[in-house]
Amino acid sequence: PETAQENIREIGPHVMFAPPRLYEGLTRQVQVKYIDATWIKRKIYELGTRIGYKVANLEFEKEPVPAHLKLLNGIGHLLMQKKLKDHLGMSRIRHAYTGGAAMGPDHFRFFHALDVNLKQIYGQTEIAGISVVHRDGDVKFDTVGTPIPETEVKITEDGEIISKSPSVFLGYYKNEEASKETLVDGWLYSGDKGFIDEDGHLVVFDRSKDVMTLSDGRPFSPQYLETRLKFSPYISEAWVIGDKRDYVTAVMCIDYSVVGKWADEKK
């Protein structure tokens, strides 16, 4: 794990699958280097990413990208994106996937702004791995995609994600009780909370056991909020609490090296 980012750069893969933690680490690496960069490099980065975000947002909304933005994005690719992607080991990436845990939309949008074709997948071992995935041209930064062929996905009354397909397992070995809890009438109960949006995309909220509820009954996902907070290069860790309380509270650990450099510059 310590050399994963270095290994990716050496290999230069065309297809990559990695957990959100690795992609988040790459994002943080870029943000820290941005803070250490010269004034001119920071301005080039800011301009390139600003244009990249505009193009990515239009593509997310399935709207045409104006010719002038395509031209500017091409210039940004030559001046900034190409070198940055090479540094991250993503210069040859055609398809990048992530899954296994929630990924913050900020990180997801960041890679699409760099023209990295990152897609999310959702599934579990009991359904042979993948049941839902983003398709090219149908990517939304806050979802995990749509079901693969011959797979049905529904949401129960209490918000749990359930799936049915020919690849659903028959049960746990010598554990009939657990099998009965997980498999009901051919439907696989995931233990995850979520919903299906108007475009048929699945939105995963969090593990049911990890979802907390405010005193007024409103649910929230601590992991989702923690991931959003840690998108900042100044925050190394975040811990969100608020179950049965009137409001949500976040306890944060700052990144001393990054904050220290910022403080020196602001003297």
Sequence positions of predicted segments:
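ATP-dependent adenylate-forming carboxylate-activation enzymes
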Residues: 1-11, 17, 36-40, 220-225
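Gly/Ser/Thr-rich phosphate-binding loop
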Residues: 14-17, 29-139, 152, 235-236
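Short secondary-structure boundary segments
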Residues: 20
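Short, charged/polar, Gly/Pro-enriched secondary-structure boundary elements
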Residues: 139-140, 256-261
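Conserved ATP-binding/catalytic segment of the ANL
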Residues: 147-214
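Adenylate-forming
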Residues: 168, 183, 201-230, 259-267
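C-terminal boundary motif of the adenylate-forming
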Residues: 193, 232-258
